[in-house]
């Protein structure tokens, strides 16, 4: 879990997740929203690439963003906690 930021948060009353890991040549971000599902974002010297497992989300994001959005069937979090979070505090 070294060098991975793991931030659960609430968006529109739904649990979401932000994870980020800095590598030598790129930054990797994992986002999970209940509306879009999982998104993987890679930022490197070539620019920003976004990956989603869903064709409809890919189409929507390609229409609204100026980044390369591709479909990738299996997007995994950078790591998974073995215990549940208490979002209510």
Model segments located where?
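Intrinsically disordered, low-complexity terminal tails
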Residues: 1-89
């Amino acid at each position: 879990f070294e060098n991975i930021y793991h931030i659960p948060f609430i968006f529109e009353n739904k649990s979401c997740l932000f994870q980020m890991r800095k590598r030598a040549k790129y930054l990797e971000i994992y986002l999970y929203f209940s509306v879009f599902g999982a998104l993987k974002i890679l930022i490197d010297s070539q620019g920003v690439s976004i990956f989603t497992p869903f064709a409809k989300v890919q189409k929507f994001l390609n229409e609204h963003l100026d980044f390369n959005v591709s479909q990738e069937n299996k997007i995994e979090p950078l790591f998974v906690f073995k215990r549940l979070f208490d979002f209510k505090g």
